[in-house]
Every structure is written in C-alpha cells, then in structure tokens.
C-alpha cells in the first residue's frame, strides 16, 4: 500500500494587524503525484503554487496563499484532492494572543530580545529619505526527515525604505530564470522600514560537488546593491534551526523554533518552507553604487 502523504502547515509567527495580509503555507510530501488546494477559494486570496516535483522517491508540493488578516478564520483549510482526499484546517499559532483588539493577535513574544526590539523602534521612528538594506542572508531549506527538500534556498533582506526593491538569483554560470523563484511583496517592520524574502528552487539535486548561488538585491532609492552567496556542499551541512512556526502531521499545535543566531530578533520571519539549515561558506558583501 502507498504511504499516506505527510502534511505540514506554516504560518507567520508575528501576528498581523487587521488591515495587513498574512502568508500561509501548505507543504505536502507523498509517494504519488499530488493535487492540493486551499479552501475556501475567494478573490481576496492570492495563491502561488510550486509544482509537484519528485525527489528520492517522494513527490513534494508547496502551495502558498496570501490572505487578508481581517478575513482569516479557522475555515481556511489545506486539502489534498488527489489521490485521496485529506484535510488539515488552519489554526492560530499559540504565540498569537486573541485578547488584542487592534491585531488579530499581538506581536510575537520576543523573549530575550525585548531590549533590541524597543531600541530599533526608537532609533528609526522618524525616517526621512531613503534607507539602505542592512540585513541580507541566504539559507538552505531542508529537513532531517525529508532530505529531498534540500533543493530550496531562502534569501531574506530587511531594513530598507522606501519599499521598492528588486531581488534576483544568480546560478553557477548565469542568472536564474524567474520561473525558478518567487519573491514576496515587501512588508513593514518596526521603525518604518521594510523587509522581504525570495525562495529559489534549485534546478538539480544537491550533490557532493560545490556549487554557489547568489541572491542579488538592488535598492534604487538608496543607490545600494547587496549580494549574498551560499556555497553548497552536502557534506558541509551544519544544522542550525531558525525561528519559524509549523504545524506538523502529528500535532494540532505549532512548534515555535527559536532562531539561534538572532539575525532578526524583533520578528519571526515567515519562510516558504519551515526548517532552515545553515550551510558553511555563506558570506555577504556590500557594494555601494555611486
């Protein structure tokens, strides 16, 4: 008999304002071709589908939706329609507090980072003019139970103003095709700046050879160009679990995995997938365009 597919729901850990949009993700891994959907289908829901792909004997598919926070409710359900119907309803992460009236839930619990968060809001409160991006990272997405998911890279950038920004990916020898990656719309962060991310699907499976992929960020308003690269060698993986919120197959509650390196202490970054593995040889260079 075919094994029943595994199903994982993802949610932003940071609670949205009522007038904001929130990203939800549904990751399904199974031994047969899959057809999944988010329900209910409404005009206010924006979908992005990463097509089903087979790796190591399993089919993997990711469906991301962007929903208005004011319309978010427990009726949102990720459904496998093929080969056999299976459902998993969205559930508010425990880090959200329904006591708040202005938010769907309050801000994420910053734990030891409350001082840094307050400082960021204070020092950047009244921003005049352009602000150059200050944080740029590239990480590989993978899980210990499903190594086939190691075919994704995540690029995150934050601290810029205004919000207009351009992200692209460079491969080993050339620019990556736009069909291989998706970039989120910039969202506001404390202090009046913005942040965004881009996810790249690698065209081939990782091997023992060393390949380098680069995320290039161009912020025209501040005349700034950043790039961050990741050299991938499967033997060089160092597991570092970053902060994310995921509801797995065996549980009805979210796991809140705290980011070890504290790159973005004032927020919980939503990623298209869920467990980030930090590979060696990552570096960031800053180029100021005159």
Swiss-Prot record:
It comes from the Eukaryota. Pfam families: C1-set (PF07654). The chain crosses the membrane at residues 262-279. The lineage of its organism: Eukaryota, Metazoa, Chordata, Craniata, Vertebrata. Cell lines producing IgD contain several mRNA species for Ig delta chains. In plasmacytomas, the secreted form is the major component, and the membrane-bound form is a minor component. In spleen, however, the membrane-bound form is the major component. These two forms differ in their C-terminal segments. Residues 89-111 are annotated as: Disordered. Keywords: Cell membrane, Disulfide bond, Glycoprotein, Immunoglobulin domain, Membrane, Repeat, Transmembrane, Transmembrane helix. It comes from Mus musculus. The keyword Repeat applies. Residues 280-290 are cytoplasmic. Its main location: membrane. The keyword Transport does not apply. InterPro entries: Ig-like_dom (IPR007110), Ig-like_dom_sf (IPR036179), Ig-like_fold (IPR013783), Ig/MHC_CS (IPR003006), Ig_C1-set (IPR003597), Immune_Resp_Modulators (IPR050380). PROSITE patterns: IG_LIKE, IG_MHC. PANTHER family: TAPASIN. Residues 5-105, 133-233 form the Ig-like domain. Glycans are attached at residues 58, 75, 112, 135, 227. The sequence of residues 1-237 is assumed to be identical with that of the secreted form. This is Ig delta chain C region membrane-bound form. It is found in: Cell membrane. GO terms for cellular component: plasma membrane. Disulfide bonds join 26-78. Residues 96-111 have a biased composition (Polar residues). It is a single-pass membrane protein.
């Amino acid at each position: 008999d075919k094994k029943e597919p595994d199903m994982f729901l993802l949610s932003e850990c940071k609670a949205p304002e009522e007038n904001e949009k929130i990203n939800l993700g549904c990751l399904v891994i199974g031994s047969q071709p899959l057809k999944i959907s988010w329900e209910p289908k409404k005009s206010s829901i924006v979908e992005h589908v990463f097509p089903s792909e087979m790796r190591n004997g399993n089919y993997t598919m990711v469906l991301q939706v962007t929903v208005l926070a004011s319309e978010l409710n427990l009726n949102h359900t990720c459904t496998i329609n093929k080969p056999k119907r299976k459902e998993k309803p969205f559930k508010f992460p425990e880090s959200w507090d329904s006591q708040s009236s202005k938010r769907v839930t309050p801000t994420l619990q910053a734990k030891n980072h409350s001082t840094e968060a307050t400082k960021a809001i204070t020092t950047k409160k009244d921003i005049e003019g352009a602000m150059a991006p200050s944080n740029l990272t590239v990480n590989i997405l993978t899980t210990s139970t499903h190594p086939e998911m190691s075919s994704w890279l995540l690029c995150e950038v934050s601290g810029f103003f205004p919000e207009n920004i351009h992200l692209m990916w460079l491969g080993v020898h050339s620019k990556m095709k736009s069909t291989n990656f998706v970039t989120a719309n910039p969202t506001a962060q404390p202090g009046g700046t913005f942040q965004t991310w881009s996810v790249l699907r690698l065209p081939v499976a990782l091997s023992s050879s060393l390949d380098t992929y680069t995320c290039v960020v161009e912020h025209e308003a501040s005349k700034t160009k950043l790039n961050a690269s990741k050299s991938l060698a499967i033997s060089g993986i160092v597991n570092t679990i970053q902060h994310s919120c995921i509801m797995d197959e065996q549980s009805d509650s979210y796991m809140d995995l705290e980011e070890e390196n504290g790159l973005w202490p004032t927020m919980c970054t939503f990623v298209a997938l869920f467990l980030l593995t930090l590979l060696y040889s990552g570096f960031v260079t800053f180029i100021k365009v005159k």
